[in-house]
Every structure is written in C-alpha cells, then in structure tokens.
Curated annotation (Swiss-Prot):
Protein family membership: Belongs to the PqqA family.
The keyword Lyase is assigned to this record: no
One GO biological process term: pyrroloquinoline quinone biosynthetic process
Any one Pfam family match given in the protein's UniProt record, by short name: PqqA
Function of the protein: Required for coenzyme pyrroloquinoline quinone (PQQ) biosynthesis. PQQ is probably formed by cross-linking a specific glutamate to a specific tyrosine residue and excising these residues from the peptide.
InterPro entries, A to Z: PQQ_synth_PqqA
Sequence position, cross-link Pyrroloquinoline quinone (Glu-Tyr): E16-Y20
Keywords of this entry: PQQ biosynthesis
Claim: Nucleotide-binding is one of the keywords in the record: no
Taxonomic placement: Bacteria, Pseudomonadati, Pseudomonadota, Gammaproteobacteria, Pseudomonadales
Protein name according to UniProt: Coenzyme PQQ synthesis protein A
Pathway involvement of the protein, from the record: Cofactor biosynthesis; pyrroloquinoline quinone biosynthesis
Amino acid sequence: MAWTKPAYTDLRIGFEVTMYFASR
C-alpha cells in the first residue's frame, strides 16, 4: 500500500480487513 500516514493507520486497516473477512 502507499499510505503516507503513520504505521498505526496501516495496522488499523489490516485489522479492519481481518474483521471484514471474519464476519463474512
């Protein structure tokens, strides 16, 4: 990904994606 924000943003997105797939 090409995020210019701090690393915690990428970590949060990864968490969001994980929860998204987990709730499918």
